[in-house]
Amino acid sequence: IDSEKVFGFKSNMKILGFKEKTKFVPEIDDSYLFDEITTKAILAGFCYNRRVMIQGYHGTGKSTHIEQVAARLNWPCVRVNLDSHISRLDLVGKDAIVLKDGKQITEFREGVLPWALQNPVAIVFDEYDAGRADVMFVIQRVLEVSGKLTLLDNNRVINPHQNFRLFA
């Protein structure tokens, strides 16, 4: 991808994206103006598989900036708001009662984090500073070098997909 044409500045990074747009790729806002320094940090996350945290005042467009970079790369992107309503179970998964062959059974249903880890998806943790301690502990494991997530509920270790990315 030509960074000058797409983002308005030159870069030495080899910027790759996906050919096809999928349902999780954000819509492009043609009027969006990219801040060069912030965009380069976000691109480094995509290009070099680095975890990137953007800081700034509430409502200044940090998550939108990440989404607009993802949109131009055709990179699937999911935003998760870490407000006080999201729990560890929402993030990791939980047992649910489901109907199977006409019978009610209990089955583990993965949350958004295991799903994202196993797919070519950029997950954006919005309002990172508002996350509950139990939620932040789960995220901390994914921030580590290997990025593996252990699901104790079903005795499984998830290795991240090569195109999984994490932003906050």
For the regions a protein language model found, what residue spans apply to each?
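AAA+ P-loop NTPase catalytic core and its hallmark functional loops
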Residues: 1-168
